[in-house]
Amino acid sequence: MGTPRGLRNAGSSSSACRFLAAFAVLLALPTLTAGLTRHYTFNVQMTNVTRLCVTKSIPTVNGQFPGPKLVVREGDRLVVKVHNHMNYNVSFHWHGILQLRNGWADGPSYITQCPIQGGGSYVYDFTVTGQRGTLWWHAHFSWLRVHLYGPLVILPKRGEGFPFPRPYKELPPIMFGEWFNADTEAVINQALQTGAGPNISDAYTFNGLPGPTYNCSSKDTYKVKVQPGRTYLLRLINSALNDELFFGIANHTLTVVEADANYVKPFTAKTLVISPGQTMNLLLTTAPNPGSPVYAMAIAPYTNTQGTFDNTTAVAVLEYAPTRASATGNNNLPLPPLPRYNDTNAVANFSSKFRSLATARYPARVPRAVDRHVLFTVGLGTDPCPSNQTCQGPNGTKFAASINNNSFVRPRVALLEAHCQRRVVPLAFNTSVELVLQGTSIQGAESHPLHMHGFNFFVVGQGFGNYDPVNDPANYNLVDPVERNTVSVPTGGWVAVRFLADNPGVWLMHCHFDVHLSWGLSMAWLVNDGPLPSQKMLPPPSDLPKC
């Protein structure tokens, strides 16, 4: 089947090193779009913010936490000029944007660009092609995304509606996050130095607000106002650093209509689970005669970790209008019944409900034939402690994370500029790939939300235990599998995805738990140029940051 057991070094592949041949001729083709050009400016600066009665200076975009909402239409060109006024290096990723032929705008530091240094600037310039729905943007350097994130809403083209009944109104997007009283850069730096697990967050947040279940936080409660008997569109984004989250609204049923900016067959649920990096669009139908003026919206963690984790519940308020009821306390709020923190069955049942529309207008273009079969093991492990150091990981080791037992080491220059010397997996243009991600239990079974840059993929199968290459493919869904950019490898299980490698460039794939990313759970695909000018990478921009 040609399944690689280890990552291949692109330096040994002459075809891989030819993939940037377009640069030799610099085919600076104009970007054709019928949409508008929308300009935004990001001034990245330190700002004092107070939560849980703790004031600290955090990185922000334009002084906002969370950052500004970006709104475009399908087909628009988005130009974001970033000015870094901090001492930290920074880069920004436009999570879920395909960046066709334009990896220079993708954003992960040392993969597609060197980071923007303090005092420097860079313009992210890209066109949103063939996508509509809810995505988001975030920093992609160290743990800076704990504060640097915001929604990216892609409206359908003018004149195009939704493939579901038009809602009465759209509610503001809700971004789930984590708040640390400590400096998060100090948290991860200490963990990497000692080899121990990092300290956990102090609270979960709704749009940066912890809510009334935490001490000194009642005034920092996020509220959503609705009217009785209406249907609203609600966009959810899990921007938490290290936690998958359950979500529910007391006494309300939700209808899921989109996942990762891809429409799905609508289904109802009282409780959702959403992994870091994932987005969902919901229809919320309010009660015609509500029994209470206010209801709790709650998030709580899902995890099977053997270590410590933030086992708290954050609450926001759904407030029916007109009402003057106080929503700052939590004693009288009806709370939604969320599953127990380690309820893997609830997660599996929810995940199994996702199906693509698979209609003529929104087809599921899942590859039926496969050119390349790849099996990657993903999980946690340990590295030996250096001889001159005392380490605080298991049995005096250092925590590590890996794909196929290889922990990714951050390069000193961007892979997109020097990919021939780095460990990547090369793919010929237009290769159809089946990727099986198998979880391991070396340091305990955990789920791993894997995010792929540059592509969406179809989730054709998943299960518990070890993947069976003989029998499991017979149960694949090749008719209407869900299309996503982030999928969670089940705890103690596997997931199979398929995608078409039709986007030339170097594309990162990594666990969206930032602690696992910091420990090395990532890799990169190198997709070679195709034969046609329209299948080759665009040349680098003149202001590309230098390392």
Curated annotation (Swiss-Prot):
Residues 1-35 form the signal peptide. It catalyses: 4 hydroquinone + O2 = 4 benzosemiquinone + 2 H2O. It comes from the Eukaryota. It is found in: Secreted, Extracellular space, Apoplast. PROSITE patterns: MULTICOPPER_OXIDASE1, MULTICOPPER_OXIDASE2. Binds 4 Cu cations per monomer. Glycans are attached at residues 48, 89, 199, 215, 251, 311, 342, 349, 388, 395, 405, 430. Its EC number is 1.10.3.2. GO terms for biological process: lignin catabolic process. SUPFAM superfamilies: Cupredoxins. Pfam families: Cu-oxidase, Cu-oxidase_2, Cu-oxidase_3. Cu cation 2 binds at residues 95, 138, 512. GO terms for cellular component: apoplast. The keyword Glycoprotein applies. Cu cation 1 binds at residues 93, 451. InterPro entries: Cu-oxidase-like_N (IPR011707), Cu-oxidase_2nd (IPR001117), Cu-oxidase_C (IPR011706), Cu-oxidase_fam (IPR045087), Cu_oxidase_CS (IPR033138), Cu_oxidase_Cu_BS (IPR002355), Cupredoxin (IPR008972), CuRO_1_LCC (IPR034288). Its main location: secreted. GO terms for molecular function: copper ion binding; hydroquinone:oxygen oxidoreductase activity; oxidoreductase activity. Its cofactor is Cu cation. Residues 43-159, 170-323, 408-531 form the Plastocyanin-like domain. Keywords: Apoplast, Copper, Glycoprotein, Lignin degradation, Metal-binding, Oxidoreductase, Repeat, Secreted, Signal. NCBIfam families: laccase. Lignin degradation and detoxification of lignin-derived products. PANTHER family: LACCASE-17, MULTI-COPPER OXIDASE. Belongs to the multicopper oxidase family. This is Putative laccase-5.
